[in-house]
Amino acid sequence: MDTKWKQLLLSSPKPEFTTGIMRWGITLLFSALCTCSFAQTKYQITVETLLKEMTSRDEMSRYPALPYRSMQQSSYDRRSVSPDRPNWFANDDGEGFIRLEERNGRKEKVLFEDKGPGAITRIWLTTFGSINTILRFYFDGKDEPGWEVPSYDLQKFGVRGLKKGLIEPDNKWNRGSLIYLPVPYNNGCKVTMEELTPERTNRHFLFNYRKYPTGTPVETFSQEVADRIPALAEKTSDALYKNMDKGFDPQSDYGKGSLNHQQSFSLNKGEKQKLNLRTGKRAISLLQFNVKTDKNLKPGTDDFALLMRSLIVTISFDGKQTVWAPLSDFAGSGMGSFASRSFFFYSDGKGIVCSKWLMPYKQDCEITILNLSPYKADIQTDIVSQPYEWDNRSLYFHTAWKQERGLPVVTWMEHEKCMDWNFATISGRGVYRGDLLSLFNHTAEWYGEGDEKITVDHEPFPSHFGTGTEDYYSFDGYFKSQTPFAGQPRQDMRNFYGYNSFFRVRCLDAIPFNQQLKFDFELLGWENGTVDYSSTVFWYGDLGSEATGSSGLEEIEAGLLPTPTQSPVCNIPNAIDFCQIQPTSKSERLRYDRQRLSGHPGKWNLKDHLVCHGGKEGDYIEFEFSGFEDREYSLSLYCTKATDYGNIRLYVNHPKNGKQLDCYSEKVEATNAIDLGTYKPVNGKFILRIELIGRNPLSTGTLFGLDCIQIEPL
């Protein structure tokens, strides 16, 4: 690239896509770039360039050379129009889509649509219902799809080489799927969904994407492109995923010119240690703390949690402090300092905390760790630094932490009483790279129905309007996992009571901003109550960039609540909950999911049940209960009734005649105990078989719900 044009590109960090003059200037700039450089490369953006960017920590530390906008389209409730109008917090987030189109006799819902050059960088899909759909990608204004996915399951995306790291999960449907494979397009993209079953179900989805300046030469995704990238896709997947389990390794090669700064010290309450690094244009490539304590201070205990929360890490670059966070949160773990793994940080849950963000500086760097806990901490630090080429795009690493207690959460049915909580507001120029939400939930229900709303540079409507905390953090609600870019290090209880932690770090879906980034979360849940929230945000920015409203020592010194040992729910005595066990056998087409029921009156064992759907008459599901003595037991079943529920027959140990139950009701309600009779176990086991036998004429479906079973000795 000609030096003159390179300098022009690097010195134009503040594009305004809504300003005609600036758009015209950018168009001229890229026309010139095309003349002097793209004649050889043809495309500036390809799947290959984006995949390589995903593993370049150096590029992540810089403002984008190509000034794209980072945006999101989702299934959020379309009644949410403005904060000064009703329904700003409306929660029918699985109903939203752009429009319905008819094409060649098909009805297709438009989920995503963009014009001009861009690239989809992340897709998240989740549903309680059938995944029997077809997703179609239409590129560059064409009438025929350029790519099809034969399911509401991104594991079937159809590109060879995709593995964990670029696609999650990689083996089976867990009610949610996620893909990070970039899908670029030169002149627009539209994604539609065709339902292949008449079943009415909610579809939650998120599309993160980049919007490039007009005229940017982008190679559109196609079968030809897909056939070209398997080796690079596999290499990228491996680089992302295999790096998650690594902390400091003295045998590793961290690059030419790397230096390891190692120091050990002890800190009592109120003491701090300063670490000064080599001066000059360098960058920290790895920062690890190994905290060793008295043998009585064991990982997983409240005392250990307090210690890790009370060790405060601050980092100053070139005379300006840009990092302030508790050590547990700096590692992406949150309260308790549980194990966390991602592309950017690692914690073993036992005292080793490792940050792998690249942290450049021009002149000097000072790291300080302060102990505010009542416990002595023996700490070993390993810091790896390397030379860094500083240019006009280079940015400093920033981290900020805040905590607020007693925040009011309201049920989604009373959404008009909801409020937004400011997760973070960042001023200056920078690139938003990720965050951690760590909290204590005082309710016995899911608290995270609230959507994220991210506005960039004072835009009139959020460019990121989400569908709930679980979707933002790629969490399907019930299965904990940790991936290169998202994870759930902690969940104390199945109903989300107590401590919970979620992290998300951003790669191609990072968000550049020139003046301000404002991030709010709605405080919406399944039950009225309170939560204690703390947020840790990670971004790269100019030296003067900062987060407003950050917390300090006063919130650290407030301490932590003890880990709860019991959830405040209505437990049915000696009950075995169907959501806590797996069926031993079922019909192939019958599906099941755990479903929260706290929005409905009635008493379920743990305010949830196992909903079975997709079945037809004759389909069944079986459960086995073992470990019983050779004596008589009384068996009682608790179920759910609703307007779309069918008729079932209940068998114990496969007798000839079972007990029939009509599960239809005009409203969602919990049944009382259903007496199944008195039985002796066979070889110490009871086998319960539930068979679908039809439906009430008034019912609109054939679902059924199982709460729990009581097996009481006589």
Question: Residue spans of the language-model regions?
Answer:
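Intrinsically disordered, low-complexity segments enriched in Ser/Pro/Gly/Ala and basic residues
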Residues: 10-11, 26, 30, 36, ...
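A short, hydrophobic secondary-structure junction motif
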Residues: 3-5, 314-324, 709-714
